[in-house]
């Protein structure tokens, strides 16, 4: 059934141009399966809504699973999606290596795979993400502007997610000169298992204890880990210590308005979700990865060459909070909740 539907879609796309109308025509009766790594994180709700909206607009169907932070469950989830007869897969990998058998299974069934936001280090998966090295640079730049000298802590992402190291590389690019000059000392550094805020908080607490609270800045790799770091700092009366993040989670944007987080690099997941849906449908219709608009060849650290598309992030600080309100990402009320005499638009 899967292969028959894919062949039908290919036949349709062969006779149509790459317009939105043709994309909608080719998507009739197609189903895209999405495997989420951990849908409990706030961020993925927005991604899902964008994917659903794009699929529905094209006349395609959406089904999904949640691996609940389990690599083993993600493999069985993908098996389940394939058994349901999906025509393409979008996979947010829990573990970039452990998910490879799922890509093999998809290939065995003639199904295209979009590696969503996180690298799946396999040339058979199209890699769609933001420029995560640049995200790391943006995080470090914002914190460095606030604290040009002092003791830094690096709260990294999950050790099973290549994005954690991409981010860390970008952060180090920005900080290296100050480190070499002796202006900055990195007094603590830790990965955050599963990107879980509770793990980030525990790591931050341990570093604060080891350093007798002599910490001037925290470069945290996403808003969840930032939230954990802020909780640990607040418990020690250190709220207001510069902390970075990414994803523009509503709670993080509120922390920026309150002054307890310095920056959240906004990766508009509405754009990412829409792109993922459109790419999945195009690939299901027989389009080559190389023909995807904006696609480029990219080589991973392991030496694999993949087709990838990188979207551009935006750093959000107290200086430009209006941008997320103007874009409809967050309401002014949600942004400014509990804020008095804060930055615009909360003043």
Model-derived segments and spans:
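Gram-negative bacterial Sec-dependent N-terminal signal peptides
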Residues: 1-27
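A residue-level marker of the well-folded mature domains of exported/periplasmic proteins
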Residues: 3, 23-347
């Amino acid at each position: 059934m899967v292969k028959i539907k894919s062949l039908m879609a290919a036949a349709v796309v062969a006779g149509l141009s790459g317009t939105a109308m043709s994309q909608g025509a080719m998507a009739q009766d197609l189903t895209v399966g999405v495997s989420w790594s951990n849908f409990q994180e706030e961020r993925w709700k927005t991604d899902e809504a964008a994917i659903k909206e794009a699929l529905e607009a094209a006349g395609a169907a959406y089904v999904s699973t949640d691996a609940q932070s389990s690599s083993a469950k993600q493999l069985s989830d993908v098996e389940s999606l394939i058994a349901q007869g999906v025509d393409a897969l979008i996979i947010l990998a829990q573990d970039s290596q452990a998910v490879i058998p799922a890509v093999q299974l998809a290939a065995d069934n003639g199904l295209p795979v979009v590696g969503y936001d996180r690298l799946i280090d396999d040339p058979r998966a199209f890699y769609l993400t933001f420029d995560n090295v640049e995200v790391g640079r943006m995080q470090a730049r914002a914190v460095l502007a606030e604290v040009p000298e002092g003791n830094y802590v690096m709260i990294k992402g999950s050790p099973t997610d290549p994005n954690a190291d991409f981010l860390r590389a970008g952060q180090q690019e920005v900080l290296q000169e100050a480190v070499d000059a002796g202006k900055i000392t990195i007094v603590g550094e830790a990965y955050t298992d599963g990107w879980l805020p509770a793990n980030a908080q525990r790591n931050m607490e341990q570093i604060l204890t080891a350093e007798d609270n002599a910490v001037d800045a925290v470069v945290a790799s996403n808003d969840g880990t930032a939230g954990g770091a802020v909780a640990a700092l607040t418990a020690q009366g250190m709220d207001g210590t510069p902390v970075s993040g990414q994803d523009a989670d509503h709670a993080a944007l509120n922390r920026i308005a309150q002054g307890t987080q310095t920056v959240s690099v906004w990766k508009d997941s509405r754009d990412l979700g829409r792109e993922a849906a459109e790419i999945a449908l195009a690939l299901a219709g027989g389009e080559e990865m190389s023909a995807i608009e904006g696609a480029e060849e990219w080589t991973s650290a392991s030496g694999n060459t993949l087709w990838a598309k990188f979207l551009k992030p935006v750093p959000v600080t107290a200086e430009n909070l209006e941008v997320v309100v103007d874009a409809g990402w967050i309401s002014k009320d949600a942004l400014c909740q509990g804020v008095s005499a804060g930055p615009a638009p909360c003043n």
